[in-house]
Structure formats: structure tokens, C-alpha cells
Amino acid sequence: FSSFEEDSQRDERPFVRKAESPPKAWPEPQRLQSILEEFGKSKKPMLIGGHGVWWGNAENKLEEVGKTLKIPVYNIPYHQKLLPETSDAYMGLADIHQYPPSAKALEESDLVMMLGGRLDNQMNFGNPPLFPKNSRLICINGSPEELEQNRSADQILLSDPSAFLEALMDFGKSRTSKERDEWYSLQKILRQEWVESSLS
């Protein structure tokens, strides 16, 4: 049995014992710039959001980036939806069985940015045929532990999801692309066709 005074150890650090927000990872400038330049060259990019986006409270920024930069947004299949079905940017699950249009998107995309997710068995560990060889795969995670699971990606970045999305927005909003607009519109058409066929 142990007994301590109510103010025990109050003269030792930490002196302030209120809850604080967790520290956030800031992206390494050179790696970030390399990824932004890859996006700048892409014509058919896509974003796959995972649990890290939710934990980082970055859902609204994810949606804003998708709509503004014309990047279709998908959700990893084993996490609750980050965006509602009514969102213009949200296409569906990155799962070729539950959402067949994602198979065509993954097959034709030239750049896949996975934010806050894992390259696990449901993501085929980042390998073909789910992620074709001719597509660049980039993983962005907010903690080193998550990033360790994504070493097979073409590029990896340790970054808080919000920080990455803000940088992507700043970089991309002045770089419009007719090809990206057409790509984004095509994914919306495929989504609508799938919804209509599911309801018929």
C-alpha cells in the first residue's frame, strides 16, 4: 500500500500539467519540394486518404485540395469515410471490389498520393496490379511508425497531413492543368454511372 500527499512532486517538472496538443511533424523541405514537383508534372493524380487524415483533423483540407486542384479523392477501404458522398471531390473507396471505378482510376493514374494510410494487404503492399509500375506512388504519414510500413513506395514523406495539404494547395493553385480538369471530370462521370447502375 502506498500513500502520497495530494501535492506530491509538484515541485518537480513538469510544473504545468494541463493537457497539450500533440507535437506535429513538419515536412523536410527537399523531400516536400520533390513531391510537389512530381505533382506539377502529373496529368492524372489521385489522393487516397487514410486514418492519419482523420486523426490529424485534416478532412476539410483534403476536400478543399481535391476540389481546388482537381484531384479525385478516395478512401482506404478499412477506415470510416473521411468525406461525405455529397462531396464533389470524394469518388469512393480505393477498393476494386467495393467500388469498381477505382480499379480504372488506379490503372490509369500517373501519380498516387496516399495520405495517412498503410501499404498493407488491402493495398497490395503498393504492388502491381493494384498500383501499376508506370504510376508513381508517394506515401505521406504523420509519424515515423506509420512511415516504416510504407517503405516500398517510390517516395515517402514524414509530415503532418494538414501541413502537406497546405503546401500542396499553395504549390498547385497557380498551376492549372487542362489534363487534370478532364481527369477529375471523368472520375465524377464514372462515379455517377456507378451510382445509377447500383440503384437500377
Give short role names for the model-derived ranges:
Residues 1-5, 51-53, 80, 144:
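Glycine-rich beta-alpha junction loops
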Residues 1-14, 35-38, 102-138, 167, ...:
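Structural signature of the thiamine diphosphate
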Residues 11-12, 32-33, 37, 135-200:
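Phosphate/pyrophosphate-binding active-site segments
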Residues 12-13, 59-70, 127-132, 155-156:
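Short, solvent-exposed amphipathic alpha-helical segments in soluble enzyme
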Residues 17-33, 198-200:
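An N-terminal, well-structured beta->alpha segment
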Residues 25-28, 34, 38-112:
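Anionic-ligand anchoring segments at beta-strand to alpha-helix junctions in alpha/beta enzyme folds, i.e.
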Residues 70-79, 134, 138-144:
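Short, acidic/small-residue loops that bind anionic groups at enzyme active sites
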Residues 79-84, 120-121, 144-148, 164-165:
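Short gly/pro/ser/thr-enriched loop/turn and capping motifs at secondary-structure boundaries
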